[in-house]
Design a protein with these regions (language model features):
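"A position-specific structural signal for the A-helix of alpha-solenoid helical repeats
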Residues: 1, 35-38, 42, 81, ...
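Alpha-helical adaptor scaffolds
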Residues: 40, 44, 49, 97-169
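Alpha-solenoid helical repeat scaffolds
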Residues: 16-19, 62-66, 80, 100, ...
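TPR/TPR-like (Sel1-like) alpha-helical repeat modules
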Residues: 2-27, 96-109, 168-174, 182-209
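Register position in tetratricopeptide repeats
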Residues: 7, 88, 117, 121, ...
Length: 219
């Protein structure tokens, strides 16, 4: 039944089944915990795309978030899912507040990356806060990418370039390549910009080639 719900994408039904799975110890504890996180994360996505009173589902998303226990609302994977849905719904300020609170409580690289994609009510404070995290996480490429993006939002072109180049020194990443390429193009360095765009595309190709593909069926 559990696999059937997964295959159908019926995450609310799977969530209702979780107590029984936990009681019967059908799955190892770690696997069950991961399944539970995925189910609740997918449920947040479903809630965000429901329509209520003619508006796409900010209210239903928030209701789904409140259904989680206080412990679950502190899990980085679920905070990430919630904040991403808030961002997609245009609730940028709310998304920034959720991420800021979570990152102050417990730093997480995935949350730090998303923090650079949201626009809070005070961009200068947002940048200052992220620079504070850099003291304890100086080699996190996701945080360096976020700092580059926050500097771009504040038109701090030189600092943005430094942070993006630092991110790429730690890890070659298509997102950082694209952001730095865009910046360099605006600064007139078209040759290096084109090189970075090409590198970013190559890195994306590597990710696609590494992804599993279905085995072709033979008639």
């Amino acid at each position: 039944m559990q696999r059937l719900h997964q295959q159908r994408g019926d995450w609310p039904a799977l969530i209702r089944l979780l107590p029984e799975l936990r009681k019967d110890k059908v799955l190892p504890a770690a696997e069950l915990a991961e399944l539970e996180r995925r189910a609740w994360g997918e449920n947040l996505s479903l809630a965000a795309h429901q329509e209520a009173d003619g508006t796409v589902g900010l209210q239903t998303l928030n209701r789904a978030w409140q259904q989680l226990s206080s412990a679950q609302r502190q899990e980085p994977q679920l905070v990430l899912a919630y904040a991403e849905q808030l961002r997609q719904l245009g609730a940028q300020v709310e998304a920034e507040e959720v991420l800021r609170t979570a990152l102050k409580r417990n730093y997480d690289s995935h949350l730090a990356r998303l923090y650079g994609l949201v626009r809070g009510s005070d961009p200068a404070r947002q940048l200052q806060l992220a620079e504070g995290w850099l003291k304890e996480h100086p080699a996190d490429p996701s945080l360096l990418l976020t700092l580059g993006r926050l500097c771009l939002q504040s038109s701090l072109w030189g600092k943005a370039r430094d942070y993006l180049e630092s991110s790429l020194r730690v890890q070659r990443n298509p997102e950082a390549c694209a952001e730095l390429a865009r910046l360099l193009a605006q600064m007139g360095d078209t040759e290096r910009s084109n090189q970075l765009f090409q590198e970013g595309l190559g890195l994306l190709d590597e990710r696609l080639l590494a992804a599993p593909l279905p085995v072709p069926s033979h008639a």
